[in-house]
Amino acid sequence: NINIIEVDLPLEEEKEDYNKRLENFFSKNSKIHHCITFTSKAHIVGEFLQRTNRRNIQIMGYDMVKKNAECMRRGSISFLIAQHGYMQGYNCVEALFRAIVLKEEINPVNYMPIEFLTRENVDFYQRTQI
């Protein structure tokens, strides 16, 4: 039986506000052992868990940004999904060019690669450029 419980962490809050929200959330939901964040801010939760010595919670986050990588190396983030922002941006501009300038029909589906990073492979990750 899976139960999904959400906590809202607005992107522009102060660290103290995040700490209050997270302390309240994890105190009320002490049986939570897995989290996922859908922004590049997984480090906010990872840093909180490390600071409060909550070691039995796994986090999966998005984006290989410096703070997320640091949390992963320390073990407070378990997994990261790395996306290729440069490639996504390039493909968007190219699709616009082909549609507007060349008047070509554009495929509405454009699958992009992602990479699943762990503590063991994070130091070997090389962000691919165009």
Q: What do these predicted ranges mean?
A:
Residues V65-I77:
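Flexible loop/hinge segments that line or gate small-molecule binding clefts
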Residues Q50-R54, S76, R98:
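Short, solvent-exposed amphipathic alpha-helical segments in soluble enzyme
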Residues I44-G46, N68-C71, G89-Y90, Y125:
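Short active-site-adjacent structural elements
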Residues R74-Y86:
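Short beta-strand elements at the ligand-binding edges of bilobed clamshell
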Residues I2-I4:
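Terminal, non-globular segments
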Residues H84-I130:
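Hinge/cleft segment of the Venus flytrap/periplasmic-binding protein
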Residues L11-K67:
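Hydrophobic alpha-helical
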Residues I36, M60, F79-I81, L117:
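Hydrophobic/aromatic beta-strand patches that form the interior of the parallel beta-sheet core
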